[in-house]
């Protein structure tokens, strides 16, 4: 009987040691399940860190985590910072993660009037994403048709207003955001769509897709908020009269350039976004408009002008006739 009891106890000990070794070193995390960012503060003890990690689903045993930290001396290598873990990690792998410098949260400002290319460049510059292509996989590319993920469309009902093959141009709301470097592009896009939902989709009335396009044109064409509602009215009346909008900003969007004065070759570029060549609104917005421009597009100010130009210093010159407009161009755009 004593031998049997001894054998059972030995077996239990072996199983316990095996389980502990598995939890400590061999356990594999979930391939896809990532935690929310976890902050490890200066001065936190091993026990406190273990408690935070267990509550977040990173580890399953505080005791094993603490024991491995003590045995390996890893506690002396911990960094304070913000970390993202995989759920269900071994204690050893969690400790290795903590020995690497934590992620840095970076403040990134997306100004009003930025297009998808500008936004992608700004995110790459701040090491939030690796390349422009990372963002475009989620949003589609500027001045091209796109195939947006169905789950994303379902999660943001206001996107149902856009054409099926349109990119997310215009929907990434201009604001100041805080992202961890790096952050996957879909997370970035969702954060910006959340901002649009909170600040634009709640307007009464909310802008429909043509209004969002109009707002983006106003945003790129004029700088002073006082001019935007007046210009919105001019553009609406030009469309109603069958007149081409003839906006340099749309040509720049089609060519990917940012020229103060577009070339004759650019004016002839065969793109649906070229409003010199094709009448009406372009197929998509050409940038992310701010609230001032959106409100201007929603409530244009009636006026008698059909033409306008913006001088190099941002002043808007209005004209009622083509002759007046040509004279203004000769005077102000020398």
Roles of regions detected by a PLM:
Residues 5-7, 35-37, 76, 232, ...:
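Short low-complexity stretches enriched in small and charged residues
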Residues 59, 128-129, 142-334:
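Bacterial extracytoplasmic/cell-wall-associated proteins, especially those involved in peptidoglycan
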Residues 13-17, 33-46, 111-114, 245-262:
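Short N-terminal secondary-structure initiator segments
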Residues 1-35:
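N-terminal type II signal-anchor transmembrane helix
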Residues 2, 42-47, 67-71, 266-271, ...:
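A broad, low-specificity signal for short, low-complexity segments enriched in glycine/proline
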Residues 22-199:
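Signal peptide-directed extracytoplasmic domains
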